[in-house]
Regions:
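Amphipathic alpha-helical "lid/sensor" segments that cap RecA-like P-loop NTPase cores
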Residues: 112, 119-153, 186, 190, ...
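Amphipathic alpha-helical segments of the small helical/lid subdomains adjacent to P-loop NTPase cores
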Residues: 94, 102-138, 164, 226, ...
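Helix-turn-helix DNA-binding segment
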Residues: 691-764
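Alpha-helical sensor/transducer elements of the RecA-like P-loop NTPase core
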Residues: 37, 64-122
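Extended alpha-helical scaffolding segments used for macromolecular assembly and cargo binding
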Residues: 24, 220-301, 310, 639-661
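Short capping/hinge segments at domain boundaries that bridge a core fold to an adjacent linker or tail
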Residues: 36-38, 144-151, 170-175, 183-229, ...
Length: 764
């Protein structure tokens, strides 16, 4: 099969027709470009001698070709590679009058060639592998056997230097390293003449594949080791050279050093860096020499158990030079596992500047305020005032300020810390991020609008992404955006640290409760119970523990959570009951008491919230709402007051809570007008978009409310669950069902459900 481009076709046609007689033409191109195919195409052209592979002819043979040129009427077309170029060949080429340029296939020619060859291969893949070199496209279309045979012949003809050069290029050697091999200058030209290299000097994938299949592995490894030693001598990068040797069983001091150096180059790929450190140890490097960096890489890759094991070996090794750094890695891993108190102890033992700041965060989070303040006072930067040092120090100060100062002060400090850390966040293994800590402070003070962009920027940095996505999901849940919360929850993935898993379970519990999905809540509660047992309470886990408290009340399992809530209260007491953090626990406690119908307990939480009302608008809002809840529980519903409180809750980001307050007040009032007003308020705050009435295929039209009831009945919810979801009574749901049954002419409940399923399907 031959497929020439249009200019080449025109020239060949002119030669065959005699219009170019006498033709004196050279075709000089690397192997695979189709020189022989062109000569085959010209076979039979009148008065034209065709000479192939002229670069391989002897001087005597070339002299005989040159003598033919003495006859001015004789035609000659010579095909040759650019190398070798003996003097006799140059003399012949110098007497020719033109040159035919052969080009690689473009996409249309590749597609046409494959179609004619009857090979349904992906065109883009073929081009990527072959660089469009026509001969390689043909070989690829012919199958592996033909491909390997052709390359075997070429490699058998290649000299030792050419093969060395090809193997070096396949190994990823850059031009400087290739030059360091000190191969003859002609070697590069000889290799280029094979057609194996692309325009950028890199090996074409199809040629690299052939080398790997045809050259024994021990020879390829030996050449790679030679390159590695040269690169180490010149302090050059070795990652691309070393990476294929992982798992190859190669050992020795040079190899171990190369693996270690490569791991340092792979900090942006922690899983790869961890494998390289492991390979260094297998090659002969002592674990104590690389253990801390290995542990950090493993931790960055999310394997905190292995990170702790490795770091512990370093800490327990008397001859390890970086025991302090090992303790810092262990402290960070423990923080991700939710062991904040133990984490703080390791950070204190480490006693580096960064570790002391991390210890302040851990001590504060575990309720040890005096120790945290003392440690921050004596903390100083050991080295230069870098961005990283400033960011870590500010994070510690911001967390402490969240307990001892105004929330706005703490939030401002943590935001500055997050901004400072952004350009250098990949330089240290963080126990938590300033962005996450700032978002927690923002969520506890009603500043979700500040938390959201802070978290989005943190997600884009690529550090602690699941942590930041889960907090974005929390914001969406509080706003009543179930779809957005679930999307962020899914984006966080399944491979979560214990701390992130706690938040993920808390989100699922919160979403099920807000959807009045009692069956779903019972299912996820099994995980919630496990999370509560496995994860100690700390200051930064009040959000999920608050959700667990309310859900426990809904499921009648408050006793199971009581010891953990007692720990939370003791922790707060150790910090002086800071309003920022205490209010969140009292707010969830209030709702748990409301669900459990414990008015005295609810009153105690409402009183605590009232005492914190002066801390800021958010705290005043939830204190006022708590007072409304107490009145509603007592049967006293002041519609304007409830509506105002509900709208204020919506304004501080507690959209679902605001809608629930209005809805529950509506259900409990005996004033028909007040009920309608509050129900309308609840629907508006919940953000339910109104839709037109749905028409059944039989012509019966359902109202918006009937359609909502129908969807929830078909979904399997009980009348009480539907009432809770729509802020109406179960009796009203029953009334809607009776009306729909009558209008649809259903003779039984089964018929009614079948009709409703059809209507819901049509509507969707």
């Amino acid at each position: 099969v031959i497929l020439l481009d249009e200019p080449t076709e025109r020239v060949c046609a002119a030669i065959k027709s005699g219009r170019l007689a006498p033709v004196r033409l050279a075709i000089v191109a690397p192997g695979g470009y189709g020189k022989t195919a062109v000569l085959d195409h010209l076979a039979g052209a009148p008065g034209v001698r065709l000479v192939d592979d002229a670069h391989l002819l002897t001087d005597a043979e070339l002299s005989e070709v040159a003598r033919q040129l003495d006859d001015e009427s004789a035609g000659l077309v010579i095909a040759a590679r650019p190398h070798p170029r003996p003097a006799a060949l140059n003399q012949v080429l110098g007497r020719l009058t033109g040159q035919l340029v052969l080009r690689p296939f473009d996409r249309p020619r590749t597609e046409t060639f494959l179609s004619r060859a009857g090979r349904p291969l992906a065109v883009d893949s073929v081009l990527a592998q072959t660089g469009g070199v026509p001969g390689f496209v043909r070989l690829l279309a012919g199958g592996d056997g033909e491909l390997v045979a052709a390359f075997r012949h070429e490699l058998d003809q290649a000299g030792e230097d050419s093969l060395c050069y090809l193997l070096a290029v396949e190994a990823g050697a850059d031009p400087d390293l290739l030059a360091a091999l000190k191969l003859p200058a002609s070697t590069v030209e000889a290799v280029r003449a094979t057609g194996y290299l692309g325009p950028d000097g890199r090996l074409l994938p199809v040629a690299a594949r052939a080398l790997r299949e045809l050259v024994p592995a021990d020879r390829r490894i030996a050449l790679r080791l030679r390159l590695i030693r040269r690169q180490l001598d010149r302090s050059g990068p070795v990652l691309s050279l070393v990476r294929p040797l992982i798992g190859a069983g190669v050992t020795g001091a040079d190899v171990a050093t190369a693996f270690e150096v490569a791991a340092g180059e792979a900090t942006g790929e922690p899983a790869l860096a961890a494998r390289l450190y492991e390979a260094a140890v297998r090659a002969g490097r002592r674990t104590a020499a690389v253990g801390t960096r290995w542990a950090e890489a493993v931790a960055r890759a999310g394997d905190f158990d292995t990170a702790l094991q490795l770091a512990d070996q370093v800490i327990g090794s008397d001859d390890a030079a970086d025991r302090a750094e090992g303790a810092q890695v262990a402290g960070a891993a423990l923080a991700h596992r939710g062991q904040l108190a133990r984490s703080a102890e390791l950070f204190q033992w480490s006693d580096t500047a960064a570790a002391r700041c991390f210890a302040v965060i851990g001590l504060t989070g575990s309720g040890r305020l005096a120790e945290a303040e003392k440690l921050l006072d004596k903390s100083s930067v050991d080295g230069p005032p870098t961005l990283l040092a400033g960011a870590v120090s500010s994070a510690a100060r911001g967390v402490l300020e969240s307990v001892t100062d105004q929330p706005t002060v703490a939030l401002s400090t943590l935001i500055r810390s997050a901004e400072m850390l952004e350009p250098v966040s990949d330089r240290v293994l963080l126990p938590d991020s300033p962005a996450a800590l700032g978002a927690l402070v923002a969520l506890h003070s009603g500043e979700a609008a500040i938390a959201e962009p802070l978290l989005e920027r943190a997600v884009s940095s690529g550090v602690l992404v699941p942590r930041h996505r889960l907090l974005l999901a929390w914001i969406a849940m509080l706003r009543g955006d179930e779809e957005g919360a679930n999307a962020q929850l899914r984006s966080a993935g399944e491979q979560l640290s214990p701390r992130d898993w706690l938040f993920a379970v808390g989100l699922r519990v919160g979403l099920a409760r807000r959807a009045s999905d009692l069956a779903g809540l019972r299912r996820i509660w099994i995980q919630a119970r496990e999370a509560v047992v496995r994860h100690p309470v700390d200051l930064f886990t009040f959000l999920p523990f608050g959700e667990f408290e309310v859900a426990a009340a809904r499921l009648g399992e408050r006793d199971r959570l009581a010891p953990h809530l007692r720990q939370a209260r003791e922790l707060l007491a150790g910090l002086g009951d800071p309003p920022l953090w205490a209010s969140a626990l009292h707010w969830s406690g209030l709702h748990a008491a409301v669900i459990a119908e414990q008015p005295e307990e609810a009153a105690a939480h409402a009183e605590a919230l009232a005492e914190a009302a002066s801390e800021g608008p958010y705290f005043a809002t939830i204190a006022r709402a708590a007072g409304c809840w107490l009145k509603v529980l007592g049967g006293e519903v002041d519609a304007p007051e409830v509506e105002s409180a509900a709208r204020d809750l919506h304004g501080v980001g507690l959209c679902w809570d605001g809608a629930r307050l209005a809805g529950q007040a509506a259900i409990r009032t005996s004033d028909r007008k007040a009920m309608v007003t509050l129900l309308d308020c609840a629907r508006v705050l919940q953000g339910r978009p109104g839709r037109e009435a749905v028409e059944h295929t039989g012509g019966v039209r359902l109202s918006e409310r009937e359609r909502q009831v129908a969807e929830l009945v078909v979904a399997g919810l009980t009348y009480k669950q539907i009432g809770d979801r729509l802020f109406i009574s179960a009796k009203t749901v029953e009334h809607h069902m009776a009306r729909m049954r009558q209008r649809l002419g259903a003779g039984s409940r089964g018929e009614l459900l079948a009709e409703l399923r059809e209507i819901v399907q049509v509507a969707s």
